[in-house]
Amino acid sequence: MCSDKNIHIAVRKLVCYGLEKSLISAEDRIYAANAVCEVMGIEDYDPPAENFTGVELEPVLRELLDYAVEKGLAEDGSVSRDLFDTKIMGCLTPRPSEVIEKFRRLYREKSPEAATDYYYKLSGDSNYIRRDRIAKDMKWTAQTEYGSLEITVNLSKPEKDPKAIAAALKAKPSGYPKCLLCEENVGYAGRINHPARQNHRIIPVKINGERWCLQYSPYVYYNEHCILLNSVHTPMKIDRAAFGKLFDFVEQFPHYFIGSNADLPIVGGSILTHEHFQGGHHDFAMASAPIEETYAVQGFEDVDIGRVKWPMSVLRLRCTDYERLVELGDKILTKWRSYTDESAFIFAETDGVPHNTITPIARKNGNAYELDLVLRNNITTEECPLGYFHPHSELHHIKKENIGLIEVMGLAVLPARLKDEMEALADTLINKGVNAVRLDPDLEKHADWAEEFAAHRDITPENVNDVIKDEIGKVFMKVLEHAGVYKRNAKGAAAFRRFVSTI
C-alpha cells in the first residue's frame, strides 16, 4: 500500500527527473507537478523540499501506477497501466511546437546529427521509447558466409493481458486515428486497442515538396530506428517518386539510411495502408556486403551496378548523382514489374494479380549515393500458401512472419515465445537428451532442427546456449535464402544475369 507521503515523494522525483532531462525548465516545475497531481487525483500535495538527482524513471512510474490502481484510477493490467503512465509522462513532455523549434534550430545552427541526437534522446527520456523494455530484448550476432547477421528476440512489445483482449473485442470501432502511423497520434489519449501517445512528438519535414513527418519507432529494433511517414493516410507505393523521396531524405539527413518495405502483401511490412519509410543510424550487414558481380547498362555508364553477395537477390547502384540512381532504379523496377521467367519460377502475375516488386534502400556512402534494390515476388503455391519466396514450413518453428525491410537488411526480429523455448530446449538437451525434444509438446516443433544440429555439435552445459543461438542464426540465413528470388547456385546466378540483360 502506497502512503500519501510516498506518493508525494514520487511526484517530486518525477518532476526532478523532468528537470534533469530538460523535458521541463525550472519555470515549469510547479505547473508540471500540478498536472501530474491532477492525473493522480492528488488534491493536497505536500512535496518534499529535496531536489532528487539521478532519478530512475521506471521505479517511480511503477510506484505511481500502483497507487493509481489502488485508488481505482487505472485497472491492473499491462494495457491499462501503459495508457495511464503515458498520460503521466504527457505532463512532462514539451509541446510539439517547442520540440520542432529546438530541432530546427539545432539543424540550422549545428548539424542534422545534432538535431536527431536531441530528438532521439527526448523520445527516450519522455518514455515514448520505453528503454527499460528495449533492454529486455535478447540480442546477439551470428557469423555466416554473408557477414555478421543480427538476431533479436522481441520482448519489448508487452503481451496483452486477458482482460485487455476481452475489452478490445467489446470496444467500439474507431476511425481516429486512422492507423498507428497517422500524425493524429501526437498527444492522443489512446484506448484499450490503440496505444496512448501523449508523450509522442513528430518533426515535420519537406519531402518531394510535400509535408512528411519524422518520428522514431517506439520499439527501436536498431540504433535510432526512425520512421518517415506521409502526413496523408495514403497507401504504400514503390515507384520512381518513392526512390526520389528516399534520396530527398538522405540529402537532408546524410548520416541516416532510409528504406521502404515492398508494396505487396507477404513481401511487404505490416502496414501497407499508410505510406512510410524506415531508416536510422545503424550499419547493417547488407550495407557492408561486397559486390560479387558487376554489370553495365547502356546509357548509365556513370553508374556502378553490381550484384551484392547476399542471401537475397540485390542489385546495388552507386553514383555521385542520385538523380541517375532514381532514373535507373525506375527503369529496373518497371522491367521487374512485368518480368516473367518460368524456368526460374518468376511470374509477373497470375490471374491478373501482380507478384513482382522491390524493397529499396538508399544511403550516402562517402561522396557517392547508393540504392539497393532487393527483388521480391509474393507468389503462393499449394505447398507454400504463405509465399514461395518466403521462409518455408521447415523454418516456421523459428520465423514464420513476413520478411520485411529490417530482416532483408540482416536483422532478424523473432517472436517472444522463443525466449522460453530456447531455455527449455537447452535444459532438455543437457538433462534429457535430444530424443526427448520430440516428446515435449512445447518443443516438438523444434525436434527435426535440434536432431540435425545435435548430430554434429558437441553440446555441453557450458556451450548449449551459444550453440542454440548460433543455430538460430543459421536458420535466419536460410530464411533469407528462401526469400531470395534467385537462389545461391549456378542456375540462380544464370537466371539473375538473364534478368539484368533485359534492363
Model-assigned labels for residue ranges:
Residues 237, 241, 250-273, 279-340:
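Catalytic or ion-translocation cores adjacent to nucleophile or general acid/base/metal-coordination motifs
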Residues 1-228, 232-235, 309-311, 325-329, ...:
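Active-site microenvironments that recognize anionic phosphate/pyrophosphate groups
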